[in-house]
């Protein structure tokens, strides 16, 4: 479960589990962080980079990804291998620093674990930028992670652990249902 992945699935993990008559566990939701895709200024995208619309941008992005798939990974791995020990040490420190910076006051353990994953993405992206792999300005990976984290937290609806939030929701439901009895 040490994987990070993206999915273009239209159904959430919770939806898939429900269709099989199951429920998701809190740990599953922390390992498979679901970020809503319509968090940008243009639906799924924040910028269209001079293109006329989201569809044109999406088609161009897909074509470029198909053509360039994997090329930056090789460059990144080669750059990392040049001084793996120093890069690993720096990444660990950056992940810790970024996670502390991103973690809201009162966040539960599950949110903290998810934020560690966001911090990993930010730190790896910033390192890739410093190594000349991305072509992005410094700080862009962290900015993008902040956008995704904000969307994830808003979608989640609370900072606590899932079990605690479920208990509170049950109590609220009971009080609401029996408030006039």
Question: What name fits each language-model region?
Answer:
Residues 1-4, 9, 13-181:
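Extended alpha-helical interface modules used as scaffolds for assembling large macromolecular complexes
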């Amino acid at each position: 479960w040490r994987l990070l992945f993206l999915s273009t699935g239209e159904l959430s993990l919770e939806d898939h589990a429900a269709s099989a008559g199951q429920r998701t566990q809190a740990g599953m939701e922390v390992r498979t962080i679901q970020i809503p895709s319509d968090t940008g200024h243009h639906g799924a995208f924040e910028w269209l980079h001079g293109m006329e619309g989201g569809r044109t941008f999406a088609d161009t992005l897909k074509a470029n990804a198909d053509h360039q798939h994997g090329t930056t990974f090789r460059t990144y791995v080669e750059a990392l291998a040049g001084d793996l020990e120093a890069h690993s040490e720096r990444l660990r420190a950056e992940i810790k620093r970024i996670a502390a910076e991103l973690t809201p006051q009162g966040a539960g353990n599950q949110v903290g674990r998810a934020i560690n994953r966001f911090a990993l993405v930010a730190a790896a992206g910033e390192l890739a930028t410093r190594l000349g792999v991305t072509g992005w300005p410094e700080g862009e990976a962290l900015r993008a992670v902040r956008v995704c984290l904000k969307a994830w937290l808003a979608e989640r609806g609370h900072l606590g652990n899932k079990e605690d939030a479920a208990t509170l929701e049950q109590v609220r439901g009971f009080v609401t249902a029996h408030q006039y009895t």
